[in-house]
Amino acid sequence: MELTPREKDKLLIFTAALLAERRKARGLKLNYPEAVALISAAVMEGARDGKSVAALMSEGRTVLTRADVMDGIAEMIPDIQVEATFPDGTKLVTVHQPIV
């Protein structure tokens, strides 16, 4: 199976998000890469489902709370930018202050 670099990046994000999801379900607080991966994957899946950029910018802020992440992580992530594939093409989605 041949994958482009972009497809490899998507799979890496998905794998990290899956790990983060499992750790969160076990009650562990997420670290920086886990938090970013989980929010990024949620945005990418929402785009695949056909949601709008505006909806994903808003929904991206509801994926995690400060209680879900280690101390100081929320402050380390002022925004997350995800290049997501929508039914009408690829667009950049920016989630400002993703962890509240």
Curated annotation (Swiss-Prot):
Catalytic activity, EC: 3.5.1.5
Pfam families per record: Urease_gamma (PF00547)
Catalytic reactions of this protein: urea + 2 H2O + H(+) = hydrogencarbonate + 2 NH4(+)
Gene Ontology process terms (BP): urea catabolic process
CDD domains: Urease_gamma (cd00390)
Annotated NCBIfam families: PRK13241.1, urease_gam
Family: Belongs to the urease gamma subunit family.
Subunit structure: Heterotrimer of UreA (gamma), UreB (beta) and UreC (alpha) subunits. Three heterotrimers associate to form the active enzyme.
Protein name listed in UniProt: Urease subunit gamma
Organism: Variovorax paradoxus (strain S110)
